[in-house]
């Protein structure tokens, strides 16, 4: 249960989560913020949350400006380059899925089939990069351990928003919820997709209950690494 670099030296990772690319396509000062965390706070790892929609140019703020996703991916690449130059590490975190519909912007409680497309592309670009770890999916929730590992049909509730981005509410003040059902491939399939292109990067898998519970692992719900450099379990407080 330890991490080693390519020289066999044990590595202890202590760092920060640098948010914004999961909800913005061109956030201000993100690169500067990451560099500050590395240089002034002496973090040796950065967790970088991403949106699979924005990775491919489906963000609302990308229409007419970055519909290919090139600029978005360039920001990510610049950050990875800066981290690697300092001989530190970065987690590519799939933070926002889209319930199987590009541009839907309803983040699912599990990855979806489009998440496989995202990870195949990431693995082709950053497979076996010595400074990059793969955070397979941010926080699974409201599914069984069977679905978590092996996949299945899932339903997520979400609150539609009106103009001004205020959550719509009924006369009693309760949020108006809608439901969407989609197929989740399961975390084993996600790891398999990464390994299928030859990427052996450490794969990080979060537990259930918003990435908190890991008791299912003790009951046999483990992820097969398929010859990679290891599976890291992730628990969020």
Q: What kind of feature is each model-predicted range?
A:
Residues 34-126, 130-142:
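Substrate-binding cleft and catalytic face of glycoside hydrolase catalytic domains
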Residues 22-26, 56-58, 144:
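A generic structural signal for short coil/turn motifs at secondary-structure boundaries
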Residues 28-29, 74, 117, 185:
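Residue-level recognition of alpha-helix initiation/capping sites
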């Amino acid at each position: 249960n330890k991490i080693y670099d390519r020289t066999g030296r044990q590595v202890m990772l202590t760092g920060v989560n640098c948010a914004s690319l999961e909800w913005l396509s061109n956030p201000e000062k993100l690169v500067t913020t990451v560099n500050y965390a590395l240089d002034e706070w002496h973090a040796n790892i950065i967790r970088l949350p991403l949106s699979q929609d924005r990775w491919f140019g489906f963000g609302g703020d990308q229409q007419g400006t970055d519909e290919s996703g090139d600029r978005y991916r360039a920001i990510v690449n610049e950050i990875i380059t800066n981290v690697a130059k300092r001989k530190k590490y970065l987690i590519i975190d799939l933070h926002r899925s889209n319930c199987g519909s590009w541009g839907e912007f309803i983040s699912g409680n599990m990855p979806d089939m489009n998440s496989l497309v995202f990870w195949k592309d990431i693995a082709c670009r950053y497979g076996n990069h010595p400074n990059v770890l793969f955070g397979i999916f941010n926080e699974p929730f409201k599914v069984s351990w069977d679905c978590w590992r092996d996949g299945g049909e899932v339903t997520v509730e979400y609150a539609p928003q009106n103009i001004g981005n205020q959550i719509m509410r009924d006369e009693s003040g309760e949020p108006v919820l809608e439901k969407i059902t989609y197929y989740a491939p399961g975390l084993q399939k996600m790891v398999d997709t990464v390994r299928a292109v030859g990427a052996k990067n450490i794969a990080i898998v979060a537990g259930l209950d918003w990435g908190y519970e890991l008791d299912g692992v003790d009951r046999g719900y483990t992820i097969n690494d398929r010859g990679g450099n290891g599976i890291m379990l992730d628990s969020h407080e």
